[in-house]
Structure formats: structure tokens, C-alpha cells
Amino acid sequence: MKLYKICNKISLLLHVLASAAGYFVMEAICRHSFIEAWNYMTQRPLVFAYNAAFIFTSSLIVYLFHRRVFWRVLVTLFWLILAIINGVLLLNRVTPFTGPDLHLITDAMKIANKYLPVAGVVAVCILFGILVILLLMLLIKGPKYQKKIKYRYNIPLILLAVALFAGSTQLALEKRVLSNYFGNIAFAYEDYGYPYCLATTIFNTGISCPRDYSEKEIKRIEKTEKNLPETQEEKRPNILFLQLESFFDPTLVNYLDISEDPIPTFRKLMKEYSSGYYKVPSVGAGTANTEFESITGMSMHYFGPGEYPYKSILRETTCESAPYVLKNLGYTTHAVHNNEANFYGRRSIFPNLGFDTFTSEEYMARENEKNPNGWVKDEVLTDEILKCLDSTEGPDYVYTISVQGHGAYPDEQILEDPEITVSGAPTEEENNKWEYYVNEIHEMDNFVKELTDKLADYPEDVVLVMYGDHLPTMGLTVEDLKNKYLFQTEYVMWDNFGLKKKNENLAAYQMAAEV
């Protein structure tokens, strides 16, 4: 009892120490290393102190309740669970846990069985249930602060602490101890700490109004557009975009030894048609953002860190895009995806992007043709693309999103007689993942050949842009790649009417205008 009284007297000091210790544990979990957490703390002490102060400020809520032990445990669990979520995610992908991921919970639940065994999902549910029961018991039976709570002092002091923390945030931004622009979100989390970065991705969303935005400025811009040459009324080709899931050239990985070229068709097309590197906004995940840039011509740099427009602003409003522009030129616009219509909310998002039709796996005759991982094979897309082209007499814009190359990739040998063998990965498990992945993209490459062969004989002019949406979820680093860049794949612009070849590296948001 005497110890309890002493702890109450120095509780603020204990909160400070506990916040610092707790934050250190959080970073150790997120970085998968106590040594890395120690290096971060000693090399960036001001950032560490700021994030510890963040946790300390959030813990001050306990002084408004008698059940202080319960609230301390609850706050601790809140931060600890967030750290565990991030730590687990970083075992499976390169990008850390962000605010927009909270909007993807329903999508995550749908594909959880592809990343976790059923027993794992059940175990998580059981542990969560036990935790809730223990918290309820602590709330009802736990220790209780016996003295009267002085709200007239506690509330103003807590508000003062929040105000001081807000002021320190602004000061840290001005002094560049922190930054609210994340060029690479994975590196930002390492540099600025998990609590700050997570909060930034939750609250810093959308596009800020430009400083010089006004009616006068818009009229000035309109005047500069009046002397542009009129659009020529000539024959317009069909425009096809094919976004290949996690597709890239695995021979760019330094340590892999691959028995044969897994993407001979794509490589041949790159030599014969316009091609180059394709800069994308994400790595290991984030298909929808590469898709957004390619469709709208807008860079994700203008949005909040880690934001998914598909899960934010596009739920509420329309957006200028290639489909809308092309519809004004007489095109009919189609979207095709061999996965569920609701994944990333596409069923409700695509109308806001200007698509006239959307064909998802539920409406495909061959939806049961799946790979060992449970994803619909890409070869089913050939017929669906041709159906879109045949459905109208005029020109068509068809944006197709493939899914076959999606993770997670099995770390066990599940291909009995793989067409292509892989060696050189650091562990047997990683080698199994790469071998599975390489054989999947080889099948995707065969699909590319089938599609281009069919389109070569199509009676109308066709331009087909093909590219990977991001690198696969393999934990790749810059040092692992010959091209030394994680945020790029490759593209090829194929056609059946003799366009001049042009080699150029492009960003995803530039491609629609380039076509």
C-alpha cells in the first residue's frame, strides 16, 4: 500500500519514463530489432523525444478517471497493438501501416486467408476475445484511485499539455526535425518515428488549395488555351491499358539464378515497340494508386502520405480523368478486372472516374480458372477485352487490371514440376517464394502473347499499354536490384498500325497524356 501511495505521488515522472520505454519497445517491434531501435534513439534523439512525448500526452487521459490502472493498461495496449500490426505488416510488405489502411479493413478481411492459415485467423480471434474479457474484469475489479479527482485542475493542465505538444509539433516542422512530406513513406517511418508518421497519414489527407488559386488566375490560364490548334477529326484508335499485377523483370534481382527467361514475350515487345521504365507511387502494395495515376494523370505526391483516393475523395465526387476526356471525343470507356468488384471499392469508384462499364470476375465465364494461390488467372482477360472492343462500333478505351501475380507467395514448394526453376535466394523459404512468383509471371507473359496475337489481327487500330503496377512483396531493397530503384517497373506501348518506336522513361501519371 505504501508503494502504491509513492507511485501515485510520482505518477507523472513514471508516465514519462514508461512512455519513453514503451516507445522504445514499439520501435523495436516495428524495426524487428532492439539494436535498430537503439541506433534510432541515439542517432535521432529529438525525434525519439518527440514521439515519446506524443505517447505521454495521450496517456494523460488517465487522470480523468478513478480506474487509472485500467486506463493505463488500455492506452499501453492501444500503442502496443498498433506496433504489432505494423511489425507484422512489414514482414509481408515494404510499406508500413498507414491511416488509409484503416479504410482497407474490409478488403483485408476478404484476402486474409491468402496470407494467414485458418488456424491463425481463429487464434487471433480467440486472443482478441480473451483480451476483451480481461479488460472488462480489470475495469470492474481493478484498483481504483480513492481520492477525489480535481477536474478543475486536471482538465486545464491536460489541455495545456496538449497545446504545448501541438506547439512543439509546429516548431519541429519549422526546424525540420520533422517533415510532413514523405517522398518515400517507408524511409519516413524510419526517420520520423511510427507514432508521428501514423498520425500524419491519418489526418493529413487530400490536396491543399494552391496559393495562387483564384477566379482571376483560372481566367488567365483559359486565355492561354484559346490559340491552341483544333483537334483533328481523324480516325481514332482503340486505347487499351493493361495493368499487370506485381509484374516486373526478376532478372534485375542481383542474387537470383533463373533457369530461363520468364518474360520472353514482354522483353521482345520492349525491343520492338516504345518502352522504358515506369515510375510508380508504391512498392510491394498499393495497386489502386498506380491505377489512379495512370487513369487520371494526377501524381500521388499531391495527396497526403500513404493516402488512397479510392478510399477517400473518390467515394464522394467525380474526378477529371482519361475516360472523361475520351468520352468527349466519342470513345466508350470500359474497366475490366479479374477480381471482386468491391475490392478497393472499384464498383462505386469507377463510375466516378468516367467508366461506362465495369466487368469484374463475378461476370466472367471462366472465373473458376485460378492459380494455386486462389487468384483468377490472367488468361481469362483476353476474351473479356475483345468483348469490350466488339460491343461498340466506335473507338473504345479499355482499362484492364490483372490479378494473377498477387501475393502472398507460398514459402513451401507447391509447384510439383515447375517450368522454370529458381535458386540463389538467401533461404529455402525465400527461394520457394521466388520460384512460385517467377512461374506465375511466366504464365502472365504467355497471356500477353495470346492477347497481342489476337489484337494483331483485329480489324480496328489498337494501342495497348502494358506495365507492372509495383514490385512484388518480396522485401526487396535498393541493393538487391541492378537498376537500384524500388519505385519502378517497365512498360511497353504495343500497336497494330505501325507507330514509331520511342524509348522513354515515364511516370504513371504521365502515361495517359503520352498515349
PLM regions with names:
Residues 1-189:
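Transmembrane and membrane-interface helices of multi-pass
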Residues 33, 98, 177-202, 249, ...:
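Secondary-structure junction/capping motif
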Residues 68, 88, 115-119, 209, ...:
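Short secondary-structure junctions and interdomain/linker hinges
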Residues 108, 239-244:
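Residue-level preference for non-acidic, small/hydrophobic
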Residues 168-241:
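Membrane-interface segments at or immediately adjacent to transmembrane helices
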Residues 225-234, 244, 249-515:
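Solvent-exposed soluble domains appended to multi-pass membrane proteins
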